[in-house]
A protein has these predicted regions:
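Membrane-interfacial entry segments at the cytosolic side of transmembrane helices
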Residues: 24-27, 209-216, 247-263
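Hydrophobic, aromatic-rich transmembrane alpha-helices
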Residues: 7-12, 338, 342-347, 359-382
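Transmembrane-helix motifs of polytopic, lipid-linked glycan transferases
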Residues: 12-16, 125, 137-159, 368-372
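Membrane-interface helix-loop-helix junctions at transmembrane boundaries of multi-pass membrane enzymes
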Residues: 18-19, 158, 207-212, 372-393
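Membrane-interface alpha helices of multi-pass inner-membrane proteins
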Residues: 178-179, 213-235
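Extracytoplasmic catalytic/substrate-binding loops of multi-pass membrane glycan-assembly enzymes
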Residues: 51-64, 74-100, 110-122, 335, ...
Length: 447
């Protein structure tokens, strides 16, 4: 049965024009999908034979909860679909069934959508045709995340037409993206929704408007919201900046990006205060500084919860963070260290497990790319600048958020997976390929 679904998704990739990648043969494209499937078996093996506790393993704990939720189909198919599509989760009959699940409810509640339920619902839906075979769930997730990666490739290839091989590597073959994007994890849904959202958005901004595209944008925004709302928030400044440039022209692109981001950050830090503006309860100082702000408070307590859980579980890759309070000063003071931790750690000295070692070696690749971008710098042309600045915005904002609140390198490795293709593409745009090959001719064989 697993083979049937593998062939089914393979045929979709082979036959559908959407999966035609400029500069890349269909055979290579199918091989990349096959590689994801191999990695899905690898992650299954690691969490089956090495990390054996299913209650602490993300690839199993939501899968096992979905099995319990799927049991509701036998009792009441109507109630099952009410839960899966979030139409009703509070009636006594449904609630008594949901209380059997281990991870439907979170220990810490910040008034934000509980994203555990999204991956449980996904697995419950797949259960309808998987008959409980884990690998069918994994292959389905591989197909979705692969679709998101295809969308990312198609967004960027017009801007790096002479670097199709390098772009293919940056999007599809980064170790962390291959590994974490191929299990039954939220990362797969994030890559799918993120990639497809940017793809549809760019089509509209490039004067290819269709009502269907707008429909898909709303669906994908919703999926991002219920999977990881913070990822949606981190990508919005870049998308809004692209819209501003679309309707204001391509002059002073960097300045427009900066102004949009500054304005949105001030609004985000003062969202609760701004809501009180009509009542006249504010001072100008409050609007600028965000005094007594819930967002900073939320970050403070989110950090405390991460630190508390890491210490209880005795996380092997624990690192010290600068402590946050609910002031803008502590946020700014700890931001540089947070960004550096995400972009450059784990390093080789941090490597106490094979998974962290893999990420450390991957970070060496990024350090090499930084040096290449410095010594073989190529000024981006005007058509590249909007998508380049968008990528920089997304990478830095997500790195900032993760770096401020996550004190475990193993968790950092996972949380930054959605930004890694964009991180690599930044250097792809900035490196002069001709200068590099001229200086190092042997690279011509590879690129």
């Amino acid at each position: 049965m697993t083979s049937f679904f593998l062939i089914f998704f393979g045929l979709i990739i082979y036959k559908s024009a959407f999966y035609d990648l400029p500069g890349i043969s269909k055979k290579i494209t199918l091989t990349a999908f096959g590689l994801k499937v191999i990695f899905s078996f690898l992650i299954w093996a690691i969490y089956t034979f090495y990390y054996t506790d299913r209650l602490t393993s993300d690839i199993f704990k939501y899968f096992d909860d979905a099995k319990i939720l799927h049991g509701l189909v036998l009792e009441s198919p109507l109630n099952f679909f009410k839960v899966v599509f979030a139409l009703d989760t509070s009636s006594p009959e449904i609630k008594s069934h949901l209380e059997k699940l281990n991870f439907w409810y979170k220990t810490h509640d910040y008034g934000i959508f509980n994203d555990n339920r999204t991956i449980i619902r996904f697995n419950a839906l797949v259960y309808l045709f998987s008959l409980g075979y884990y690998h069918i769930h994994a292959i389905t997730m591989c197909f979705l995340s692969f679709t998101g990666l295809v969308a990312i490739y198609k967004v960027f290839i017009p801007h790096v037409k002479d670097k199709s091989k390098e772009l293919f590597f940056a999007v599809f073959l980064l170790p962390s993206v291959l590994f974490w994007g191929s299990g039954i994890l939220k990362e797969g849904l994030l890559i799918f929704s993120l990639g497809c959202l940017i793809y549809q958005f760019m089509k509209i901004t490039n004067n290819q408007f269709q009502v269907a595209r707008l429909f898909w944008i709303f669906i994908l925004l919703g999926l991002l919201f219920i999977t990881k709302v913070y990822l949606l928030l981190m990508i919005m400044p870049g998308l809004i900046s692209l819209l501003v440039i679309k309707y204001s022209g391509t002059k002073k692109i960097a300045l427009k990006f900066i102004l949009v981001h500054v304005l949105l950050i001030i609004m985000a830090l003062n969202w609760k205060v701004i809501l009180r503006l009509p009542g006249g309860e504010l001072t100008g100082t409050e609007v600028v500084t965000g005094k007594s702000l819930d967002l900073l408070n939320m970050l403070k307590y989110k950090q405390k919860d991460f630190v508390h859980e890491a210490k209880i579980e005795k996380a092997g890759s624990y690192i010290e963070l600068g402590e946050l309070d609910n002031t803008l000063y502590s946020f700014l003071k700890n931001s540089p260290k947070g960004i550096i931790n995400v972009l450059f750690r784990p390093h080789l000295l941090d490597s106490r497990s094979p998974i962290v070692l893999l990420a450390a070696l991957e970070n060496l690749i990024f350090i090499l790319l930084i040096f290449l971008a410095v010594f073989f710098f190529k000024k981006p042309h005007d058509e590249q600048k909007p998508i380049l600045y968008f990528s920089i915005s997304f990478v830095l904002l997500l790195a900032l958020l993760i770096g401020l609140v996550v004190p475990v390198l193993g968790a950092i490795v996972r949380y930054k997976v959605p930004m890694l293709p964009f991180y690599a593409i930044i250097f792809l745009i900035l490196i002069d390929k001709e200068k590099l090959i001229k200086k190092l001719p042997f690279l011509k064989i590879l690129i």
